[in-house]
């Protein structure tokens, strides 16, 4: 059974479409991936992302010789957001060989994003900065807040919903209409038992005085 040329062409198109049904991103060896679309990822050198808008958070990591000593450099966290479909992309970072180059990169990170044809792909870029202590940072929380504030590289779809924010911060309502020092039912029973006990132990005169006291309170 022979297949017509049109059928073969259609099959070939389907195969090619299946081969590029998403976006593949190759990461440079001198980078550390922090988050992918607001979530942690185990990937180290290659990512497979859905078509559409995607957001990566990464940093430059590397070593260089400075005045005879080995220096370890880790940059600020960089956020890059891009729009792509059915393609293969490559991220490239410059080589850093001095303290001045490291400082310059932190001030203004130079990153390139190209497709398989070496054509530059447009993307939005920003830095995820935090003042004070840097250890133990919650990057997922920071990026969620970043995306909620309409920043340069923010993605509205990755911002937490209003419902999630309400659930995360439960509202405590105080009832000011009732006294705070309320006595529960079990305490009331214990008090009644104690009063009954002392009433039985009292003489007749004390019992009369107790009754008058109770009646005056009603």
UniProtKB/Swiss-Prot annotation:
Transmembrane segments: none annotated. The keyword Cell inner membrane does not apply. Keywords: Signal. Pfam families: DUF2057. Residues 1-21 form the signal peptide. Belongs to the UPF0319 family. This is UPF0319 protein swp_2242.
């Amino acid at each position: 059974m022979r297949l017509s040329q049109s059928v073969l062409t259609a099959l070939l198109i389907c195969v090619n479409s299946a081969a590029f049904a998403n976006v593949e991103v190759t990461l440079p060896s001198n980078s550390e991936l922090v988050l992918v679309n607001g979530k942690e990822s185990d990937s180290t050198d290659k990512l497979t992302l859905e078509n559409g808008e995607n957001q990566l958070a990464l940093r430059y990591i590397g070593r260089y010789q400075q005045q005879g000593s080995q220096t370890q450099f880790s940059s600020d966290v960089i956020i890059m957001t891009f729009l792509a479909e059915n393609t293969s992309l490559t991220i490239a970072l410059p080589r850093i060989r001095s303290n001045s180059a490291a400082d310059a990169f932190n001030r203004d990170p130079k990153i390139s994003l190209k497709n398989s044809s070496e054509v530059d792909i447009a993307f939005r870029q920003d830095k995820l900065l935090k003042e004070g202590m840097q250890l133990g940072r919650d990057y997922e929380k920071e990026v969620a807040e970043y995306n909620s504030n309409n920043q340069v590289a923010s993605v509205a779809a990755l911002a937490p919903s209003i419902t999630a924010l309400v659930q995360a911060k439960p509202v405590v309502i105080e009832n000011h209409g009732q006294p705070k020092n309320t006595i529960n039912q079990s305490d009331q029973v214990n008090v009644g038992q104690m009063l009954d006990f002392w009433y039985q132990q009292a003489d007749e005169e004390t019992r009369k005085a107790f009754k008058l006291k109770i009646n005056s309170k009603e």
